[in-house]
Amino acid sequence: MSEMTPREIVHELDAHIIGQQKAKRSVAVALRNRWRRMQLDVDFRQEVTPKNILMIGPTGVGKTEIARRLAKLANAPFIKVEATKYTEVGYVGKEVEQIIRDLTDIAIKLTREQQMGKCRQRAEENAEERILDALLPKPKNDWESTETDSSSNTRQVFRKKLREGQLDDKEIDIDVAQPQVGVEIMSPPGMEEMTNQLQSLFKNMGQAPAKRRKMKIKEAFKLLIEEEAAKLVNQEDLKEQAIEMVEQHGIVFLDEIDKICKRGETSGPDVSREGVQRDLLPLIEGCTVTTKHGMVKTDHILFIASGAFQMSKPSDLIPELQGRLPIRVELDALSANDFKRILTEPHASLTEQYIALMNTEGVKVEFSESGIDSIAKAAWQVNERTENIGARRLHTVMEKLMEDISYEASEKSGSAFVIDADYVSAHLDNLVQDEDLSRFIL
């Protein structure tokens, strides 16, 4: 779990996302509150529920990017899902409880990596012994099995060479466990327990014996470490810790929530809109979900929802769902100055990416101040005249601008290009000024 302060979280987000300070502060405080809650007494801790967030803002302003970067900072089970992928219970499609099942699978993987990391040293020792056994086979007869000083010394010599990497390219025959073939069964609602039993049955049937393989010691060592570490992990403890991690630290990011708003008077069942909203209510409020790893309570899982709300309003969500998303954050539309900052300030910005890509061909590309101003202005103008798709417009404009250089780069190794205002004007002015061309090309 992340122990970063809100200011540190915002600083990390600033390295990748321009502006939107209100949204950054809200998610930073929400993430820090997860840590604060865990410092309370156990009894009092149960009373402190997370304050779920609804982020509202036009497309391309950073809502999804905030989620992506937050996932890396959280160091906790985190899942980002699109609300449009789910349907009401009883209809064909994913039901919303699948979100928690997927989140639990993520927690299992996270916990397994942590536990394997703790026992890695012991796993390395065991793997080392298995490789030495393959290099120096033990005698099969009892009268030869007594270890002599010379055989012990030989083993130590090989151990030293192995640790120094002198034997990395030597090939050996070792027995490696075969990967298990998983069988995924789609279960109807309420029959998850039977599905879990069937999956366990297929899992046991699919266990293949270890297979002898010939490989280099360097590759064998990596495989054997993973195999030995997996043996040292207690599966029951793993499941308990993972479920605890989901219940106490889990975060769900619900994207495109505006797409499940009811629009106008429609007849017939609203399978993937209002029905999904109703199914989300108990999940966000707190309920128990059956997963193949055990029962998971959702009372303290943090939900962050986001939507553009261009065709609808937050008030179009059913009132009960609005009440369960108490913190509202509005993200601002991007200006030409924001576009300019997006092109230069973030870590691995768009301009840096193109410079690095062309550098692989031996072509030097430089973006002047006037060139960056012109690119930002062009993207902003197209957004104003046509559909406003936010910062995503920069990708389209940059790709069109760099098209000629990218195409000819392989034949122009050693060349240098300066992208200034004149270059941008020559390549983009016709497209920006002509509204019809802008609609179809940019």
From Swiss-Prot:
Pfam short name (any one): AAA_2
Subcellular location: Cytoplasm
Keyword Transit peptide attributed: no
Species of provenance: Shewanella baltica (strain OS155 / ATCC BAA-1091)
PANTHER family named among the record's database cross-references: ATP-DEPENDENT CLP PROTEASE ATP-BINDING SUBUNIT CLPX-LIKE, MITOCHONDRIAL-RELATED, ATP-DEPENDENT PROTEASE ATPASE SUBUNIT HSLU
Function noted in UniProt: ATPase subunit of a proteasome-like degradation complex; this subunit has chaperone activity. The binding of ATP and its subsequent hydrolysis by HslU are essential for unfolding of protein substrates subsequently hydrolyzed by HslV. HslU recognizes the N-terminal part of its protein substrates and unfolds these before they are guided to HslV for hydrolysis.
Gene3D superfamilies linked to this entry: 1.10.8.60, P-loop containing nucleotide triphosphate hydrolases (3.40.50.300)
Gene behind the chain: hslU
Family of the protein in this entry: Belongs to the ClpX chaperone family. HslU subfamily.
Subunit (UniProt): A double ring-shaped homohexamer of HslV is capped on each side by a ring-shaped HslU homohexamer. The assembly of the HslU/HslV complex is dependent on binding of ATP.
Region (Disordered): 137-156
Protein name from the UniProt record: ATP-dependent protease ATPase subunit HslU
Gene Ontology CC terms, in alphabetical order: HslUV protease complex
